[in-house]
Amino acid sequence: MGVKYLWDVLEPCKKTFPLDHLQNKRVCVDLSCWMVELHKVNKSYCATKEKVYLRGFFHRLRALIALNCSIILVSDGAIPGIKVPTYKRRLKARFEIADDGVEPSKETSLKRNMGSEFSCIIKEAKVIASTLGILCLDGIEEAEAQCALLNSESLCDACFSFDSDIFLFGAKTVYREICLGEGGYVVCYEMDDIKKKLGLGRNSLIALALLLGSDYSQGVRGLRQEKACELVRSIGDNVILEKVASEGLSFAEKPRKSKKQVRPSVCSKKGTLPLVVINGNNRDPERLEEIKQVIDAFMNPKCHQADSNTVSRALAEFSFQRTKLQEICHQFFEWPPEKTDEYILPKVAERNLRRFANLQSRSTEVEVNLPLHKPQMPEKCPVSEIIKTRKVQGRECFEVSWNDLEGLESSIVPADLVERACPEKIIEFKEKMAAKKKKPKPKQKQKETSSPTKSSSLVELSLELQHLDLNSTSLVSRSTLEEAEQENEQQNSKKHDYLRLIDSPDRENCNNAWSNRDRLGVGMSSFPLYPETEVIDLISPCPEARSRSVSRSYQEQKSHDHQLETVIELSDSETDDEEHCKKARELRIFLQNIRKDIIL
């Protein structure tokens, strides 16, 4: 909880920064605060079963890894003896636990129940963080006190915590909130701003805790934060604690005309401060001793010292264990290895690029400009090449391929980061793009080169088809001409036979045959049109026309003759050979003569 209403008092000092503000920083994280915050998001059974809080913790870590943040997780240790009454009072309110009547000693801390649900959540967070190369520092008592000590000793740049009493333990920069995703940000409070804008130093904040109430004291009932701040400022930051330790909280008294003293409503033996006496002597030695204990708990908390082996080990850097992380994510979230790699590997690659950029900037500061890929270079550039330009949430980025990073082919990184780390890669990419613009596209090349060949091949093919068509038509015309000549010869021979038999004695027999055929009613289909023994009398008048049925064979023969004539005419018009045209002309004249002779 921290100090009551202290965040409201510090509201004018609130600042919001984008997530990039955290890049290349070393931060301490109050692990209990983060897990309480993430667990409050959804307390349903499904959320607990699917470990939604642990997923949120994992995504926060990977976001900080991408920004090249060195993370130090700090967990709570034992409960301070001065905080035990407050802790039990909270448990009673939550679980309705009856008071056992045992008064704990003020100097004895209370070990936490390591088998509780929240302790199991902390263990899971430690496991998943260890696979990412992040170790957890187990505090002796309060985690925020340990974070504040590391920050005050400049072993970290800032602390993540929403317990406002972290400033009372000596923290300089505190991030209260963090938001990921689009437009991600952090909410920051700095002790320098608190001193400048509010006139409140660390001693003044401890005095406010005594007046307003905290985990270690109940404060003064009915005293508002505005009035408390005015009282503390009026005394001054340098002497406020001495005054409170020697005189108590008498400066916060509200005198009345009545001389009747009001007894404290809370027993002082339970480790918490009694309410301030409205009128009367407030220098009770027992109460003054309790005030001194609260001041000492804030000024000298039980923590690992900055030069201890425990702190040195927590500050050491460890590499993340890819295989172990895949196993843990499959156990906790049922993720396949590919999904775990998709989440973490791009962030690790971006962290490596930021470290390389820092190395480049340091070498530039000391005027040691080492060329890339040379033996003198301590590290190799992690970027293999730039693939294409991208824009993510309105920010210019590059999609790049990586060197020596198994499981990751390419990912997207900010363009300004690539420019700081390896500007020569950008130059190479621009030259490559300029060369592509000068040269025609591969598809256009294929079209331009293939169109002449296609057109030439089409011309050749059309010529071949025309040649074949001419050959076929010439062959057809020649065959049809030969057939027509044979038929004409047969008709001429028949014609001469018919003319020779005009005056023969069989004429009467022929007429009788016609009359008999008409009398019997036999159609033309039952007899051939021009039998060999039949004689046509061209001098005598033709017999009367009668309706006769025409056989199908005669119709087919007639249509066939018509087709032959058509073919002959078409072939005549399409032939270019002079000899062929001459023969065709002679054939037409011959056929015309035959038609005239038949008509006559």
From Swiss-Prot:
Keyword flag Metal-binding: yes
Region entry I-domain, spans: 130-218, 130-219
Cofactor (UniProt): Mg(2+)
Class of this enzyme: hydrolase
Span list, region Disordered: 433-458
Region (5'-3' exonuclease domain): 215-353
Main location class: nucleus
GO MF term list: 5'-flap endonuclease activity; crossover junction DNA endonuclease activity; metal ion binding
SUPFAM superfamilies per the UniProt record, alphabetical: 5' to 3' exonuclease, C-terminal subdomain, Chromo domain-like, PIN domain-like
Effect of deleting the gene: Normal sensitivity to DNA damaging agents. Mild UV sensitivity in the gen1 send1 double mutant. The double mutant mus81 send1 exhibits severe developmental defects (e.g. strong growth retardation and impaired leaf and shoot development), increased endoreduplication, slower cell cycle progression, spontaneous cell death and genome instability associated with a dramatic loss of telomeric repeats.
Residues the record lists as binding Mg(2+) 2: 163, 165, 215
One Pfam family per UniProt: XPG_N
Region feature XPG-N domain, mapped onto this chain: 2-97
Cofactor binding note of this UniProt entry: Binds 2 magnesium ions per subunit. They probably participate in the reaction catalyzed by the enzyme. May bind an additional third magnesium ion after substrate binding.
Sequence ranges of Basic residues compositional bias: 435-444
Family per record: Belongs to the XPG/RAD2 endonuclease family. GEN subfamily.
UniProt protein name: Single-strand DNA endonuclease 1
Organism annotation: Arabidopsis thaliana
Gene: SEND1
